[in-house]
Regions:
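A short acidic, Gly/Pro-enriched loop at the edge of an enzyme's catalytic core
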Residues: 151-161
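S-adenosyl-L-methionine
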Residues: 28-92, 100-109
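A short SAM/SAH-binding and catalytic strip from SAM-dependent methyltransferases
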Residues: 159-179
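A short glycine-rich, Lys/Arg-flanked "PGG" loop and its adjoining helix->strand segment in the class I
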Residues: 181-195
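SAM cofactor-binding core of SAM-dependent methyltransferases
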Residues: 89-148
Length: 277
């Protein structure tokens, strides 16, 4: 059976095919928005296309689209209880990559539900292959720009946890405005979290780790439960700390291994939702 309340996810165009143009809705003019990701190929090799055709209806949500392949129409919303067919604690992963972390968590915790937002179609296809191979049913995937979609996709206090593991670091100074973790995104995550819920982040770029820590501590709706802990001598504020121990549920993915092999270390950062009045 397909995902309740959603059409089966359409396949990306075959290699060499021209995608159908998408006109602006309502005759409006589309205004470019700074994105936290780069445009990557949507083409799938034959084996991943077969996987997509076979299992996408079980896992992939097809929303009404706005302007652009990764945008979600502002009048489209998800009801997790309808989508998953039950009421269970929800974790949202922003940027699931190939699904190593997500599928491992879903297999370990069948009593929880997991919603992935990802823009890289080959990564989604690999996630689907892993999910089907593991036999997990508590995953749903949405091809979407999270920063654009989340403000209208889900109700307040929907999620137990939000994960942002190893987002694009945008290393060049002129590109850092593209980083996903920002003050405005923190407010959106806080809106989604239930009281006491947590935002878990990890990065292996030191300056992004310091930024994540600073974003959490500047957000009026989040608390850093590890304030002052694990000071980093390389930090511009070396005595400040504010870093969490490694989350026990965060596996060492292929992506993290590449960073370790390059001599980078991972920082974990946590923001806890301050209870609503």
């Amino acid at each position: 059976p397909g995902v309740p309340g959603a059409a089966a996810r359409s396949l990306p165009p075959a290699p060499g095919a021209s995608p159908r143009p998408r006109p602006a809705q309502g005759g409006g003019v589309f205004m470019a928005r700074t994105k936290s990701f780069t445009r990557r190929s949507r083409e799938l090799p034959p084996n991943l296309r077969r996987t997509w055709e076979a299992v996408a209806p079980r896992y992939v949500i097809e929303p009404r689209r706005g302007v652009g392949r990764t945008t979600v129409a502002e009048d489209f919303a998800l009801d997790p209880a309808e989508v998953f067919g039950r009421c269970a604690p929800l974790t949202i992963e922003v940027g699931s990559g190939t699904g190593e972390q997500l599928v491992a968590a879903a297999a370990a915790h069948p009593d929880r539900d997991y919603l992935a937002l990802e823009v890289w179609v080959p990564g989604i296809a690999k996630l689907l292959s892993k999910a089907a191979g593991a036999g997990v049913e508590n995953i749903r995937v949405l091809e979407a720009d999270a920063a654009q979609a989340l403000p209208h996709l889900l109700d307040d206090a929907t999620a137990r946890e939000v994960w942002t593991f190893f987002p694009d670091p945008w290393r060049k100074a002129r590109h850092r405005k593209r980083r996903l973790v920002s003050g405005s995104f923190a407010l959106e995550v806080a809106r989604l979290l239930e009281d006491g819920g947590v935002w878990r982040m990890a990065t292996d770029w030191d300056d992004y780790a310091w930024q994540m820590r600073d974003v959490v501590e500047a957000c009026p709706l989040l608390d850093n439960p590890h304030a002052g802990e694990r000071p980093d001598p390389a930090d511009p504020r070396p005595d400040h700390g504010g870093f969490a121990p490694r989350y026990e549920g965060r596996i060492v993915t292929h992506f993290e291994t590449r960073g370790l092999d390059a001599g980078r270390r991972a920082h974990d950062i946590v923001g806890a939702r301050i209870p609503r009045a």
